[in-house]
């Protein structure tokens, strides 16, 4: 539980501190989602419940789809602006 909390806090710090870089923001969001998945997985193992393990697989697949959508938006943004920096 402490490991997942530490990973989630690292993800939040990465998201807050890297507001200008879109790629690092996407990576920070992925770290937060994987921390939540780890917490669900550890809870399901401790309670001997298969539903939590199934739900963790579902979370991982949603996180993968989210990263694909985010990176495709990033490619479209790069083609439009010529840079991935968020500075206005």
Swiss-Prot record:
EC nos: 7.1.1.2
Catalytic reaction(s) noted: a ubiquinone + NADH + 5 H(+)(in) = a ubiquinol + NAD(+) + 4 H(+)(out)
InterPro entries reported in the protein's UniProt record: NADH_UbQ_OxRdtase_chain4L/K, NUOK/Mnh_C1-like
Keyword Membrane assigned: yes
Main location: mitochondrion
Alphabetical keyword list: Electron transport, Membrane, Mitochondrion, NAD, Respiratory chain, Translocase, Transmembrane, Transmembrane helix, Transport, Ubiquinone
Gene Ontology biological process terms from the UniProt entry: ATP synthesis coupled electron transport
Transmembrane segments: 1-21, 22-42, 55-75
GO MF annotation terms: NADH dehydrogenase (ubiquinone) activity
GO cellular component labels: mitochondrial membrane; NADH dehydrogenase complex
Compartment(s) of residence: Mitochondrion membrane
Pfam families: Oxidored_q2
Entry keyword annotation includes Glycosyltransferase: no
Top-level lineage group: Eukaryota
Membrane association type: Multi-pass membrane protein
Biological role stated in the UniProt entry: Core subunit of the mitochondrial membrane respiratory chain NADH dehydrogenase (Complex I) that is believed to belong to the minimal assembly required for catalysis. Complex I functions in the transfer of electrons from NADH to the respiratory chain. The immediate electron acceptor for the enzyme is believed to be ubiquinone.
Family: Belongs to the complex I subunit 4L family.
The protein, known as: NADH-ubiquinone oxidoreductase chain 4L
Organism phylogeny: Eukaryota, Fungi, Dikarya, Basidiomycota, Agaricomycotina
Gene field: ND4L
